[in-house]
Structures are given as structure tokens and as C-alpha cells.
Amino acid sequence: MQDIVRPIDECRVCGHDDWLDVVSFGSTPLAGNLLGDEDDAGGETLFPLDVVVCRRCWLMTLRHVIEPDVLFGHYRYVASDAGSIIQHMRKLVDLCVERIGLTDGDLVVEFGSNTGAHLELFRQAGPRVVGVDPARNLAGVANDRGVETIPAGFTAEVGEEIATRHGLARLVYGRQCFAHIPDIHEVLNGVSALLAPDGLFFVEVPYLVELLKNNQFDTIFHEHFSYFSLGSLCTLFESHGLRVVDVHTADVHGGSIVVFAAPAAADHEVRPAVAEMLAEERSQGIAEERTYREFADRTERVRAQIRELVRGVVADGKTVAGYGAPTKGSALLAACGLGHQEIRFCSDTTVLKQGKILPGSRIPIWSPEQAAGHVPDYYLLLAWNYAPEIIDNEKEFLENGGRFIVPIPEPRVISAESTL
């Protein structure tokens, strides 16, 4: 166990070791480690899930780190093909083309590139593209679709290899993966080795302010090492000679920020949005201990409310299933103490997940076609970040008397007569 999990000694952003304890979820299985029928129910390994925040730079982080090979060697998260996500990815392509004038032949590199879906959109706009992803199965899918992808973590060595083979990159970026990387300094070493002097680097990360404000405790799981504010990212990037020049909000994954940085010597205008967001973070109390204590109190209350609502529905003789089987859904079920006794199944469109079993809760994952033959009275909307899109697509379920339980920011029941 000591070989694969260890407590962190210092903040991965600023190097200090002055921690404020925020919340503990005890020891839980890996939320993304889906099981097969052959897996022994008693054989799941439990890992501590404790959250702390650095009092120096206000990075929120897990207190323990699990070896990435254990977490991501055969990763089953496939980038969503939901319409809202595709639209968002297209907007990012357009923004980058406009922001730095990407032209045919320029090099774009994405780390944590998953199946290459976003790079494919960049390629359609003209640039050359290369992906980097440590999940060998997903890198294989990307290569099969014609998006060159290196099956590795993004490091200085990998950055140098790409630069040698393809030249320097005008754009290097990572979407919704930066929080998954324990050694973020090594990633930034890779950026420094690869980024052209006039290039841009960006990361898209779930936004800590939204997590705290909207009780998004289910986004806290072992695969997410870090929870970033703009302030903590500014501190991190400055230590690598990068200056934050722009920031955008994105209504994806519960609320995210897209943070652009450039070499400090580059002639990139710093947009007013940077100072505006930093000021807003101060006003939201991101650097005040009370903010994190209040989040912990709300988390405890909302977990109990979700548990009591679901168990009350089941006690009334109604059936409940999960809608979606995202990693955060597994984390929510574990945090609320819900399992197969309350939740009959989870319906998910991801083929790689179908036929598997959620860790800890032991809830089977079915395809939508299989679920259609066992329509529950209630769906617990585990993929709540797509709630408007899902509810709009499931009008027939609601019109036939079905109900959705939307758990975050606090549980509420949606019927044909009610709205979000």
C-alpha cells in the first residue's frame, strides 16, 4: 500500500506545508475503477480521501497521492459527445485561432488528449496536431482516428521529443486534465520545452469558486489531485516564467475556467478579465479559512439530504436508478452511503462502461436500451452537469410520471410540472 499511496509533504504549487483541513470522506474505492462481474466484492482496495487547502497560495488538494499508473493506466473516461461539449470545443478552437492567429501548418499539442476529439476539430481548421495521453487504450483510439497521439504523460522529455520531430508549437493546452496530474511542474517543464516564443498555453480546469459555492463535493475523488482558483494558477505559472494573459469562464463540468498564459517576455496583451476575476475571488473569500469551513458544513448537510431523500423514496415502494455513470456519480454515491440496495442500476451511453459495476456501491451499469425495459420511478441524475440537456431529451419519461432527483447544489425533484 505504501508503494502506491503517500501523503503529500508540500503544496504542489508553492512548496509550502501549512495546511488547513477541509473535509474527510474517509477511505473509499477509486471512483473511476469500474469492476467486472468476476471482481470480488470484498477485494476492493480503499484509499483515504481527505481534502486540505494550502494557507499560502490557496490551492485545494487531496492530502494523499495515489500513483498515476494505478489511476490512469486503463482509463475509462471518454470525452463527452454531448452537444453542449462539442459546441464548447468548437468555440475554443475559434477563440484560439482568433487569439493567436493560428494558420495552416502551425502545430497544436494537447496533453490529456483522450480520444483526440478536440484535436480533430483543430485539424479541421488547418493546424497540424499531436496528442499526448497516458491512457494507452484512449491513445489507441485517437491514433486509429488519425490523430497522432503519444501514449505517455506529458513531461519535458516528451515536449522535447515533439519539438524535435515537429518543431515548436504555437499552442499547447490541456482540457479538464490538469487536476489529474500530481507533478504539474513537470508538465510545465514540457510546455517550456515545446512552446514557441510567440505561442500560447492554456488549461481548462473546474473552477474552485464554483465547487465551493455550489456544493460540488462529488467532484472530489482520487483522480482529481488539485482544485484550482485563478490565483493559484497565476502563482504556479509565474514560477515557470509564464504570465497569465486572459481568462474565460465556461459553463461545462459544473463551471470551469479557461486560463491562457504566455512566456513572460512575449508581446501578449493582458486582458482586463484577469484582474477582474482575481478581484472577484478575493470578494468570494477564496483566501479566507471560513470559506472552506462553511463548504464542509454544507457538504455534510447536503450528503444527508440526498441520502434521506433517496431512502425515503425507496421506503415508499418506488424504484430509483442512476442516470449516467460518471466518476463523480460514483463519488457521490460513496459520499452519501448509497448502493445497490437503493439504486437498481445506472444507465450510461458510454460503451466502455456498459456491463461494468460501480466500485463500492456495486451498482450495475446498463446501456440505455437495456434500461428502457426497466424504467424506474425516479432517476438520480448523477450526470447533473448536463441536467438541462438531459431533462429536455427525457420529456417522455417526465410526461409518463417519472421524476429526476437533481442532487447538486442541493437535492430537488423535477417532474413534468416543475423546472430546474
UniProtKB/Swiss-Prot annotation:
Gene Ontology MF: a single term: S-adenosylmethionine-dependent methyltransferase activity
Keyword field: Antibiotic biosynthesis, Methyltransferase, S-adenosyl-L-methionine, Transferase
Enzyme class: transferase
Name of a matching Pfam family: Methyltransf_23
Any single GO BP term: methylation
Residue stretches spanning the membrane: none
UniProt xrefs under InterPro entries: Methyltransf_Zn-bd_dom_put (IPR013630), Methyltransf_Zn-bd_dom_put_sf (IPR038576), MeTrfase_14 (IPR013691), SAM-dependent_MTases_sf (IPR029063)
Function: C-methyltransferase that acts together with NovW to catalyze the formation of dTDP-4-keto-6-deoxy-5-C-methyl-L-lyxo-hexose from dTDP-4-keto-6-deoxy-D-glucose in the novobiocin biosynthesis pathway, an aminocoumarin family antibiotic that targets bacterial DNA gyrases.
Extra remark beyond the main annotation: It is unclear whether NovU acts before or after 3-epimerase NovW in the novobiocin biosynthesis pathway.
Entry protein name: C-methyltransferase NovU
Organism of origin: Streptomyces niveus (Streptomyces spheroides)
